[in-house]
């Protein structure tokens, strides 16, 4: 007998307005209240506030709600610095005073470590810099608006594919922010504006970089308009006609300097978004490693050599491991350009066993790792097996740092120092650093 598929009925959501007391922030900086002992996550609400909410999602274990209005405001609330804050998906903590953001993030880091059973340790002072004008990179979305026949130019709305039109962003470095208005005007004047994908702006130490993704070739007039714009403003121009093709059209090769080392990059490469915090982060990592001239250091997830190259100036040998082949080539080139012959880079998938790798038999005295948000679960057993004296773990996700810390501690290491770096002010994200010693 044939059976017909019957889709489950979509669970209905109680849309009545409800008054709640917000008790704390979650790990993504949404306010948490409790209704019938079940947590309700409320974007934009702060602890000690009373709020009128409306459910937008109700699950068995939790609910999500929209903030309708506040009947009692926290003394720690402030007016957002950006006119687009309520709509733009970039920042989600501008309504909380910056000093309180630091406290909340520090608490989040400590709580996650404690939840994983990691014992308390020496907590370093948070590393801070400017809370505004800090982002040296921005990806600007472009969509053709059929009603206006103009490009929508800006950032994605919160939980949406729609675009918030932006001409000024207070968290962008001023060198990039100053170009938003004129860039919007230029792109809308191009004949081929319908064929634009997105735009990226990156601030290098030797100038501002403009990357334009386009899906059809520019005509001669459009090419000249782009070139004239960049010449007039001394911008470095890259065009990307395909996702894996990058053409350097105008200007110098971009680089940034850290600890007197020049690190060259392309606008497709990952670099830390906050230059000032990155400088402090590298300096702190090198200090925590307590380096000497005889050390042999392994740098995992090394990228372009952000840590490897400064390390090479202070120790006997550095080996950098990176999963992306193009990044490895660029790191090797950076070492050569900086005349550092005691650092070697290899490409390897760090989620796979590395016993057969040529570098795995080296006796490393110290290890540094700086993985992506997914963490380094696949490599932690290897780190422990190599038995370094010291491990410094740099993390952009405290949840995976807490998880991975357990693996080292189980193998005889002790967490001796932990610190937060305010890499992403006005967002729920945080950078952290942990020191493990045998």
UniProtKB/Swiss-Prot annotation:
For S-adenosyl-L-methionine, which residues are the binding ones?
A: 272, 301, 306, 322, 349, 370
* UniProt entry keywords in alphabetical sequence: 4Fe-4S, Iron, Iron-sulfur, Metal-binding, Methyltransferase, rRNA processing, S-adenosyl-L-methionine, Transferase
* Active-site residues from the entry: 396
The biological processes this protein is annotated with in GO are: rRNA base methylation
Could you tell me the EC number(s) of this protein?
Answer: 2.1.1.190
Which residues of the sequence carry a binding annotation for [4Fe-4S] cluster?
82, 88, 91, 169
Q: Name one GO molecular function term.
A: RNA binding
Q: Which family does it belong to?
A: Belongs to the class I-like SAM-binding methyltransferase superfamily. RNA M5U methyltransferase family. RlmD subfamily.
- Name the chain's protein: 23S rRNA (uracil(1939)-C(5))-methyltransferase RlmD
List the gene name. Answer: rlmD
């Amino acid at each position: 007998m044939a059976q017909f598929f019957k889709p489950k009925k979509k669970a209905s959501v109680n849309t009545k307005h409800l008054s709640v007391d917000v008790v704390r922030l979650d790990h993504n900086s949404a306010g948490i209240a409790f209704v019938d002992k079940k947590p309700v996550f409320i974007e934009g609400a702060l602890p000690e506030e009373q709020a009128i909410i409306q459910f937008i999602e109700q699950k068995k274990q939790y609910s999500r709600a929209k903030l309708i209005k506040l009947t009692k405001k926290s003394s720690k609330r402030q007016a957002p610095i950006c006119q687009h804050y309520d709509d733009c998906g970039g920042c989600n903590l501008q309504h909380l005073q910056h000093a309180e953001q630091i406290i909340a993030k520090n608490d989040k880091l400590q709580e996650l470590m404690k939840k994983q059973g990691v014992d308390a340790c020496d907590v370093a002072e948070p590393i801070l810099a400017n809370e505004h004008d800090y982002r040296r990179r921005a990806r600007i979305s472009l969509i053709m608006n059929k009603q206006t026949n103009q490009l929508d130019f800006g950032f994605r709305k919160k939980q949406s594919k729609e675009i918030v039109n932006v001409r000024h962003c207070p968290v962008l470095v001023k060198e990039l922010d100053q170009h938003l208005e004129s860039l919007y005007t230029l792109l809308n004047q191009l004949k081929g504006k319908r064929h634009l994908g997105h735009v990226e702006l990156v601030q290098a130490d030797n100038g501002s970089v403009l990357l334009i993704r386009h899906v059809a070739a520019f005509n001669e007039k459009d090419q000249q308009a782009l070139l004239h714009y960049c010449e007039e403003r001394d911008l470095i121009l890259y065009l990307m006609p395909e996702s894996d093709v990058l053409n350097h059209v105008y200007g110098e090769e971009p680089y940034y300097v850290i600890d007197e080392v020049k690190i060259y990059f392309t606008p497709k490469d990952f670099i830390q978004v906050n230059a000032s915090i990155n400088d402090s982060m590298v300096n702190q990592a090198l200090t925590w490693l307590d380096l000497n001239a005889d050390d042999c250091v392994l740098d995992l997830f090394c990228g372009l050599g952000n840590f490897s190259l400064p390390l090479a100036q202070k120790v006997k040998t550095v080996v950098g491991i990176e999963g992306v082949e193009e990044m490895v080539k660029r790191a090797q080139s950076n070492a050569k350009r900086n005349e550092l012959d005691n650092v070697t880079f290899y490409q390897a998938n760090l989620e796979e066993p590395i016993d057969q790798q040529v570098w795995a038999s080296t006796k490393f005295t110290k290890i540094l790792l700086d993985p992506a948000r997914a963490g380094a679960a696949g490599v932690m057993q290897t780190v422990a097996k190599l038995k370094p004296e010291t491990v410094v773990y740099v993390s952009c996700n405290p949840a995976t740092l807490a998880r991975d810390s357990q693996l080292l501690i189980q193998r005889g290491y002790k967490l001796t120092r932990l610190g937060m770096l305010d890499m992403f002010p006005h967002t729920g994200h945080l950078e952290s650093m942990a020191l493990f010693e045998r």
